[in-house]
Amino acid sequence: MEYKTLRRDEHFFGLGEKTGKLDRRGESYKMWNSDKPCYSVVEDPLYKSIPFFMSSYRYGIFLDNTYKTEFKFGTESRDYYSFEAPGGEMIYYFIFGKDYKEIMKQYVALTGQPIMPPKWALGFAQCRGLLTTEKLSYEIAEGYRKRGIPCDIIYQDIGWTQYLQDFNWRKENYQNPKKMLADLKGMGFKVIVSQDPVISQANKKQWEEADRLGYLVKDSTTGKSYDMPWPWGGNCGVVDFTIPEVADWG
């Protein structure tokens, strides 16, 4: 655990995808990637962990630790804040800069600069939890174009899959997905499907094929494909995307 002096007028920003107010002072946060459906405005942790924050006193701290770390911004004392990890080495980087932009520039130089996404990926994206039918996708696309509202992307939520966690289109919701994708492309839309990196055992054929090909993450204790309970889709096998052949197979 590391303790730092907490100034009376100090404020903190960062940590990535977190609920609540932008100023992190007076709150505590855990870094532990978690799939939380229908989360509340105070839920923590969530999907993404970025153990980096910036202070209003012109510095940033990046905690380089992959364990279940925790940040406490004055929740235990008015005089200090802290961050901790249950294991691994306590390695962190203190980054000073004249402003937030300079601090971010140094942080990116340390962690690596992300690639610039294609222009369409920076546009407006239509996404909602119930967007899981071909009919609704057409209605939404036509509505945007009819009203002249700019939109570049239409998402299909997890219900596009047959068993909630696999790589097959849900037959009763999508009569001709190939044509739908072509039609939406013709209207100027890109389509992104929501996809977790797992295959539900409910899709017995696909799960057994992935298991036979060795495309699922192995349980180190048994040597068999790891059996992962998932929030939806039941027990699943985790697809090992570090295997180059998996991308072509999926």
What is the predicted function of each stretch?
Residues 16, 115-249:
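Aromatic-lined carbohydrate-binding/catalytic grooves of carbohydrate-active enzymes
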Residues 1-118, 127-129, 134, 141-146, ...:
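Catalytic and substrate-binding clefts that recognize carbohydrates or anionic sugar/phosphate headgroups
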